[in-house]
Amino acid sequence: MAAALMLLALGGYATAQERLTLRIADQKGGMRSQLEAANALQNLPYDIKWAEFPAAAPLAEALNAGAVDAGIIGDAPLLFALANGAPVKAIAVDKSNPAGTAVLVSPGSTLKSGADLKGKRIATGKGSIGHFVALKALEQAGISPKEVQWVFLGPVDAKVALLNGSVDAWATWEPYTTQMVKTNEGQILVSGKGLLPGNTFLAATDSALNDPHKRAALQDYLQRLAGAERWAYANLDSYGKTLGEIIRFPAEIARAQFANRQSQWQPLAEETVAQQQTTADFYLANGLIRTRLDVKPTFDRRFSVPAAEVTP
């Protein structure tokens, strides 16, 4: 009922004034690819201005600067941004299998477990979900973060560094994990399964959330996004081909990495808030944030996801 009333308000805005524009931040092969493949952007009562980013860090910077209204971002980089004062809130969560976030090594590497990372060079993006899984892998092995050499690089440069031996390991995420394994260019040393909650958020700026018309548009956008994701999983072969063309990966790899994620948009629940608090406390313990962050105020739980999208 609340969502319907918000859409009525949005419709009134669209007829009374010039069309509202939502500025949405995305990463290549992310939300836009699903929405377009599923034809879920038909009859929009607002316009979307897309901004594509190569990784979470610059996307978070755009949210912080107010250059976009909303964007999709992993739990770790969102937390990193929030701890640095970004005026944003999570409005929904995309729950997924975290196994594809992993620490990779070369096929011929002498490293056989997380315990072998001591004293090694690990490439990843600072504050990224890859950084998070690397830290969790070290914790599991009883290794201090100070006992490894961090090499902070973007995905493209990190891959090159692993392939040419400049680093010993690469902590990354999908689709890179599946690509490296499928092409025999890398193998998983430590998987994120059992280490990470597997949460990715749709986050919006405070200014967008405080605007009732943009908030209504965001609710509509979320409904379409959840439906598009479900369509993508019901049409894996078709979507895998489309996704492969967008991210310039073979269709087989694009399909496999998406299927492995098992993602599902859900409304924000207490469990998700608790998981994010655990992540925040972990970041504090590892010196990535300076003061303890109470994450509860960083969630806006007014948004709903269709019941059909949530597994009972």
Language-model regions, residue ranges each:
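Sec/Tat signal peptide C-region and signal peptidase I cleavage site
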Residues: 12-16
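Conserved C-terminal helix/tail region of periplasmic/extracytoplasmic solute-binding proteins
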Residues: 281-312
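Soluble non-cytosolic domains of exported or imported proteins
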Residues: 29, 54-57, 72, 124, ...
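Solvent-exposed, polar/charged alpha-helical surfaces in well-ordered, non-transmembrane soluble domains
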Residues: 33, 61, 65, 79, ...
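Secondary-structure end/capping motifs
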Residues: 211-290
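Pocket-lining segment of extracytoplasmic ligand-binding domains
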Residues: 76, 151, 156-245
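Short, glycine-/small- and polar/acidic-enriched structural segments
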Residues: 17-144, 149-152, 168-174, 187-196
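Bacterial N-terminal signal peptides
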Residues: 2-9
